[in-house]
Structures are given as C-alpha cells and as structure tokens.
Amino acid sequence: MKRIVMIAAVGILMLPSPGNASPLADRVLKGKAISSDNMKGNCLACHAIQGAEMPGNLGPPLLQMKLRYPKRKVLHDQIWDATKKNPQSIMPPFGKHGILTDEEVNLVVDYMYSL
C-alpha cells in the first residue's frame, strides 16, 4: 500500500504546474504578438487570420499552415524573403530587410503552425 501511495505522489509531483505555460505555448504567444505588431510582422495588414479583427485580404488567409508548409524551413524562408521565390511578391522580405530577426521569424513560424 505504501508503494502505491509513493508512486502516486511521485506521479502528481511530475505533473506540470497549471500556472506555467509550456515553452512552445510561450513561443506561440510571442509569435502572435510579433505578427500583430505594426512595427514588426503586421501580418493582419495583408492576411486574414481566424478570430482576428479587421484582417487584410491582399495575401492568402493564414490557416492550416502545417498542411500548406509541412517543412518549417520553407515557411521560414517565405517570411524571411518572399521575393527569393517570387521576385514580384508584394510581401516584404522581413528578415532580409532587418524588420525581423531570425529568432522573431522562428517565433512567427511557431505561431503560424498553431493556426
């Protein structure tokens, strides 16, 4: 009986605290903040995002991003410099022009993958 109680106690102690967000959840929130920041990503200026107010309609809607971009690097590269794949793209080359750092682009990718 003592052994069962001890195992249960250890199991309970190993559960994550409800007050602590997972590292991925934290990254998603940071990516969302960047994507809606007028001085940073500002994705809503051109793209529709489900649940967002006043979305743009110049670019494709940002949904099912994992299905559309199964390889993270492809989505990262699109955000970093969309003109590399399509020189006529109106999407700003966020990384190439120093609008976003590599880490900020990765945070936005984490957010996009959550959509």
Predicted features along the sequence, with ranges:
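Axial heme c-ligation environment in periplasmic c-type cytochrome domains
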Residues: 56-65, 80-107
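Bacterial N-terminal signal peptides
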Residues: 7-14
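C-type cytochrome heme c attachment motif
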Residues: 36-48, 61, 90-92, 106-110
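Electrostatic cytochrome c docking/interface patches
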Residues: 19-38
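Gly/Gly-Pro-rich "capping" loops immediately C-terminal to redox-active cysteine motifs
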Residues: 44-80
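Extracytoplasmic/secreted proteins, especially bacterial periplasmic and envelope-associated proteins
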Residues: 30-34, 57, 70, 74, ...
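Bacterial N-terminal signal peptides that target proteins for export
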Residues: 1-6
